[in-house]
Amino acid sequence: MAGKGIRNYLEHRPLSVSFEVTYACNARCKHCHLGGPVPDEKRATADQYAELCREIKPFVAQISGGEPLLRRDIEEIARALATRGKAAMIVVTTNAALLTKDRYLRLREAGVDEFSVSLDYPDDRHDAFRGIPGLFRKIEGLIQELHEEKRKAITFSCVVQRDNFLDLPALARLAIEWDVRINFSTYTWLRTKDMGYMVPKERLDDLRSITGHLLEIRRKHNNVFASEYVFNRMIEFFENGGIPDCRAGERFFIVNPDATLSPCGLIPGQYKTRKELRADFMPRNTCTECNTSIRANCEKPLWFQFKDNIKNLSG
């Protein structure tokens, strides 16, 4: 599997493509511009997504939103991407409010390799940040229901920001306790234009110390997905307010609900083909304003791609 990722890197093919199958969401996250229903949303079929996936050939196909579990045909979409789409790895990105043990098992059977479950605090504060009362306990209950699974296909996804960066070690320890993995993604102000959640420069030494501790946990337990390269870029983003040389459109991009393409989830577009997206967007792309996990991991130099993927896929 790692070989396909390296091959995509060398052939300038996307490492990750996020199929945003709906913009509708049942959460009201403080850091996000989405939320609520989307009346009369135009949505592609499972077959249309699979056809695109087969043509694009990403290393990772994410099924995301919005909240993807709001789609009643989500299992059909996953199965289509895994079979007709020939996706090497399928990840469902979810807040988990609608994720039951039964649905988890059905999606696993359909071909889902991993669930990226949002978790930003190691306690009930997560509910307020995501706008869903009882969400932390819901996630805790799901993990307990899956205790008999030989390997829980769950990776927590934490958005690192001003109000929670001191809690990152506690989140990593919780992931160890619950026998799951955890990833850390940098807060981006591009979604809401709110700079208030940026970790202030005067606290970056604290963040450096915390990420050093997380790397120790990673070496010992192999349950932290984010690597030293990603943490260094995270600190650089908070220090400078941006990261140059964005590779959106090449290393990663978005499939919209209607199967048109966007450079990323923060820059909307309706390109019909990858060729059209690259030709129009990439020459004029000067954006520096995010360092989300998909960007940080897709833009690693080749040596870090190899080293980090071998480490992550062995876990």
What does each model-found stretch correspond to?
Residues 1-114:
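Conserved alpha-helical substructure of the radical SAM core
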Residues 13, 240-246, 258-315:
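Flexible mid-to-C-terminal extensions adjoining Fe-S/redox cofactors in radical SAM and related proteins
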Residues 14-19, 229-235, 253, 269-281:
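Short, intrinsically disordered, charge-biased short linear motifs at domain edges
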Residues 24, 28, 35, 249, ...:
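Cys/His-rich metal-chelating microdomains
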Residues 37, 66, 120, 187, ...:
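Flexible loop residues that form catalytic
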Residues 42-45, 105-249, 257-258, 262:
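Radical SAM enzyme [4Fe-4S]-AdoMet core and its adjacent flexible, acidic
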Residues 70-71, 100, 161-165, 270-271:
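Alpha-helix N-cap/loop-to-helix initiation residues
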Residues 73, 186, 265-268:
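Short clusters of small/polar residues that mark proteolytic maturation junctions
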